[in-house]
From Swiss-Prot:
Pfam families: Cu-oxidase_2 (PF07731), Cu-oxidase_3 (PF07732). The keyword Cell division applies. Predicted to be exported by the Tat system. The position of the signal peptide cleavage has not been experimentally proven. HAMAP family: FtsP. This is Cell division protein FtsP. One of its GO terms (biological process) is FtsZ-dependent cytokinesis. Disulfide bonds: none annotated. The keyword Cell membrane does not apply. GO terms for cellular component: cell division site; outer membrane-bounded periplasmic space. It comes from the Bacteria. It is found in: Periplasm.
Amino acid sequence: MSLSRRQFIQASGIALCAGAVPLKASAAGQQQPLPVPPLLESRRGQPLFMTVQRAHWSFTLGTRASVWGINGSYLGPTIRVWKGDDVKLIYSNRLTENVSMTVAGLQVPGPLMGGPARMMSPNADWAPVLPIRQNAATLWYHANTPNRTAQQVYNGLAGMWLVEDEVSKSLPIPNHYGVDDFPVIIQDKRLDNFGTPEYNEPGSGGFVGDTLLVNGVQSPYVEVSRGWVRLRLLNASNSRRYQLQMSDGRPLHVISGDQGFLPAPVSVKQLSLAPGERREILVDMSNGDEVSITCGEAASIVDRIRGFFEPSSILVSTLVLTLRPTGLLPLVTDSLPMRLLPTEIMAGSPIRSRDISLGDDPGINGQLWDVNRIDVTAQQGTWERWTVRADEPQAFHIEGVMFQIRNVNGAMPFPEDRGWKDTVWVDGQVELLVYFGQPSWAHFPFYFNSQTLEMADRGSIGQLLVNPVP
C-alpha cells in the first residue's frame, strides 16, 4: 500500500495532537531499566519447575498486555546448570493448547530434545532428566510445537539457558549474573496502540515487526560498574537478523558463539546476530562514558506515518541497550584475556558429504516435513560435510550436533564465526563440518530446520537419525 498525499496530511495532523501518537512510537524515546530475568539454578539434585502459562506484561509504559510465559512472566527465567550435572526439569502446561519445549543447543540424546513425541496436552507435564556433558555455552529454550512454534515463541515461550564449567569459572571475565553479566534477549514485535502484541502470519517468509524489544521492553538501559561488562546476546526473533554496533564506534569483543568460547577474543566493529544465534561479548566501560548498542537505521518520519495505515517492517527505533557506567574505576581491572581456551578447536575428517537446499517455498530439498520420514541417517562419533544453500537469506539450525563453518560463499568465515556452532545465517551457500556427538532414534529424531519460524511451521524441517555407537 502506498501512502497518498491526503493520508500523509491526515496523519501529520493526527501526530500533532496530544496523545494521538501510537504508544510504540511515543515510547521509543523513553528508556526504562533492563528487566533481568530471575536466575533458576540446579542445586543438589532438586528439580527445576517450568510452568507454561498465561501472564501479563508491560511492553510500553502505562500498559499491560496478556501474554504467555514461563513461571508467571513474559519469557522465562534464566536457567543455569553445570557440566557434569544431571538436571531434572518438570515442565507443566497450563495453557489451553498443546505445547512442546526444547533447549536449543543442548547436547543430549534425541528422546530428551522435546518435539512431537514429547507433546504436552493442557494440564500435562513432562519431566526429562538432562545429562549436562557439554562445555560452557549460552543456549536458549523455547516452544517447538509443530505448526505452532512461531506463534508460541512470539507469545513469550522462550528463555536463556546457561551451561558453566571449570573453564568459564576460572577465566578472568565478568560472571556475576545481573551485575556485570547480563542476558540480552532481542525480539521484534508489532504493538497496537494499547501496547498489545499483534501477530498475523505472513503469506510467505517470516514475521518481522516494527518495534524492537530487549528482555521484553523498548530501548532499555542498565547501570554497570566501570570496567568490563559481559553481554549474552540471543536473537529470539521469528525471522529478523540484526547487525549490532556500538553508538560511539568502540569495538565489541566477541568471546563466545552458540556452542561455547572462541579460542581467543575477536574484536569487531559490527556483529551479525541471526535468528536463534547466541553470542557473548565484552564491552570496555572503563572510560566512564555512556554508550548504546544499536542495530542500523531507524524509520524515517514518513515510514512512521505510514505505520498508521499499514503494518511496517522498519524498526521505529534501532536502540538495543544503553550502558550507563556508575561509580569509580576499580584500582585493579582485568585486561582482556589473550586466550579463552587452552587449545585450538580441532576438526575431524568427514566421511561423507550432503547437500541441503532451502527454497523460497517451504520444505528442505523439495520435501515438506513428515513426522514419519527420516531424511538423514548418520553415525554417532563421525563427521560429515554439509553444503547448505538458501534461495532467500535465512538462518539454519541443527539439533543435537555441533558444527564448524568451513566457508561462506567460497570465502573463509569471519573470525567470530570460527568456533563451535549450531545455527548459521545462510545468504547463498555455506559449507559446514558437522560432528554427531549424540544419538537419536526414529521415534525421537533430531530436527534440522529453517530458523525462520514460520517457514519451519510450514514444513522447512528435516529429521535426523544418528545411530548410536555399537
